[in-house]
């Protein structure tokens, strides 16, 4: 918004017909002053209030990409999604031990629809079968606005129907709870819908209540949740940021509420715990363990809280024989070292935690990050190991895909209200759209560099 005046002045000088935006380019959104029409063969589709994108083969629209696509990518594909709830006689499943053992994970239909309708039409034919295979990899569904919670019910109903039809092994639902008020307090790219100053805590509790209602309705569906990426980690290292300091008590109150309300027999939860390059440093490790354990015990040590999730939307390796130069000074240069350093401190404080790791974008090691803290759309990355419980470490429950690969980390447009400088760094792929929207060039990068390959 700081460039609004200059944008208005520039608009007065523009010719009557503006240049058309190229395929995948931005064509609208809050604060956008560039082209609003697309080249032939593409249409301007509004994906969220901040971003509209020229999508090939699409028709102009002012709604978000549908999240109720019937496409499914699990091995059982004969049962269409249904919104019918379970019968009163449906048994409640109980999560105990490693919640991933004995289950296959639900392949996110929304992500599958992005790959099939956004990515594949413009890919070279040689990459299309590989992209189709990516769409079949289970990835977490992000409940990043309250409006997506009903879709959770649609997916749980679909899982329930498939399980009743004999899915073997049974399917588990996988979701990210991500809607704190004043979210992303130390950055700008993923600011959310709720403000602490505008009834944000109450709104968040209503959001959690709605999630709980879905989980109770589908009590026979085993469901795994990742709770609030970046939130608690920001309270360890970024209280010098005014927005984080102001949000501290609200974050703690909201996360506490989530852990208590979602502590259900059919649920397993993992609190987000940043990553090795954030909280693995010796100065951060102890305070982080203290905070995570306190949050866990203050919530009553909920049975459904299994442990911590690391490397969410990040790029770190699981296990390295040689630490990259950008990790210098941190003995915990990979996620295996990080969790094995963290676990004893947690246990001593009353939290016998297990871990999961996001491997969706860590296929290339070492990364091409200029600095370990560079997080936005990093160049040269590739899809990593597929979801698996074969981790080789008793602390590590599973490798999973939490970040949907191909969705942007943040915009490189410096005039955007949600622009974060990290997205303009030399090691960030540009031009990039708003956080959460489709980034075709990034998907192609991940696909081309996938390790193991597709």
From Swiss-Prot:
Region Catalytic: what ranges? 95-454
Q: Does the keyword Secreted apply?
A: yes
Q: Which residues form the CBM1 domain?
A: 20-55
Glycosylation sites (chain numbering): 413
**Active-site residues, Swiss-Prot/TrEMBL:** 184, 230, 409
EC class (word): hydrolase
Q: Which Gene3D superfamilies match?
A: 1, 4-beta cellobiohydrolase
One of the entry's Gene Ontology molecular-function terms is: cellulose binding
Q: Which interval of the chain is the signal sequence?
A: 1-19
**A GO BP term, please?**
cellulose catabolic process
Which is a Pfam family this sequence falls into?
A: CBM_1
In which compartments does the protein localize?
Secreted
Q: Which GO terms describe its cellular component?
A: extracellular region
Highest taxon of source: Eukaryota
Q: What is known of its domains?
A: Has a modular structure: a carbohydrate-binding module (CBM) at the N-terminus, a linker rich in threonines, and a C-terminal exocellobiohydrolase catalytic module. The genes for catalytic modules and CBMs seem to have evolved separately and have been linked by gene fusion.
Which protein family is named in the record?
Answer: Belongs to the glycosyl hydrolase 6 (cellulase B) family.
Q: What does this protein do?
A: The biological conversion of cellulose to glucose generally requires three types of hydrolytic enzymes: (1) Endoglucanases which cut internal beta-1,4-glucosidic bonds; (2) Exocellobiohydrolases that cut the disaccharide cellobiose from the non-reducing end of the cellulose polymer chain; (3) Beta-1,4-glucosidases which hydrolyze the cellobiose and other short cello-oligosaccharides to glucose.
Output this protein's name.
Answer: Probable 1,4-beta-D-glucan cellobiohydrolase C
């Amino acid at each position: 918004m700081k460039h609004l005046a200059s944008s208005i002045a520039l608009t007065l000088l523009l010719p009557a017909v503006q240049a058309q935006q190229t395929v995948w380019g931005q064509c609208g959104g809050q604060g956008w002053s560039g082209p609003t029409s697309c080249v032939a063969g593409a249409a301007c589709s509004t994906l969220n209030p901040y971003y509209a994108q020229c999508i090939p083969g699409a028709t102009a629209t002012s709604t978000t990409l549908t999240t109720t696509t019937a496409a499914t990518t699990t091995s059982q594909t004969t049962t269409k999604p249904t919104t019918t709830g379970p019968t009163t006689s449906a048994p409640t499943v109980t999560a105990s031990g490693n919640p991933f053992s004995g289950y296959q994970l639900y392949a996110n239909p929304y992500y599958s629809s992005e790959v099939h309708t956004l990515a594949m039409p413009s890919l070279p034919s040689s990459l299309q079968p590989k992209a189709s295979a990516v769409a079949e990899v289970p990835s977490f569904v992000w409940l990043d606005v309250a409006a997506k919670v009903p879709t959770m019910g649609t997916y749980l109903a679909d899982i329930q129907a498939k399980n009743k039809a004999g899915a073997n092994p049974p399917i588990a639902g996988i979701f990210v709870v991500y809607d704190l008020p004043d979210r992303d307090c130390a950055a700008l790219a993923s600011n959310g819908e709720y403000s602490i100053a505008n009834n944000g805590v109450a709104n968040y509790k209503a959001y959690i209540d709605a999630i709980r209602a879905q989980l109770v309705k589908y009590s026979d569906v085993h469901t795994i949740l990742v709770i609030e990426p970046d939130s608690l980690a920001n309270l360890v290292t970024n209280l010098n940021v005014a927005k984080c300091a102001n949000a501290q008590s609200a974050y703690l109150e909201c996360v506490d509420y989530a852990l208590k309300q979602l502590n259900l027999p059919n649920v397993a939860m993992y609190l987000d715990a940043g990553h090795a390059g954030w909280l693995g440093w010796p100065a951060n490790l102890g305070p982080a363990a203290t905070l995570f354990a306190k949050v866990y015990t203050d919530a009553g040590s909920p049975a459904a809280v299994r442990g911590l999730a690391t490397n969410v939307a990040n790029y770190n390796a699981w296990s390295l024989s040689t630490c990259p130069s950008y990790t210098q000074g941190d003995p915990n240069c990979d996620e295996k070292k990080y969790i094995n350093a963290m676990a004893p401190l947690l246990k001593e404080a009353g939290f016998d935690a297990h871990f999961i790791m996001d491997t969706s974008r860590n296929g290339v090691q070492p990364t091409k990050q200029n600095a370990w803290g560079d997080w936005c759309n990093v160049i040269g990355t590739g899809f990593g190991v597929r979801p698996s419980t074969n981790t080789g470490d008793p602390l590590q429950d599973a490798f999973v895909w939490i970040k949907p690969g191909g969705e942007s980390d943040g915009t490189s447009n410096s005039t955007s209200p949600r622009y974060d400088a990290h997205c303009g760094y030399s090691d960030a792929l540009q031009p990039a759209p708003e956080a959460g929207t489709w980034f075709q060039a990034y998907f192609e990068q991940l696909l081309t560099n996938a390790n193991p390959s597709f």
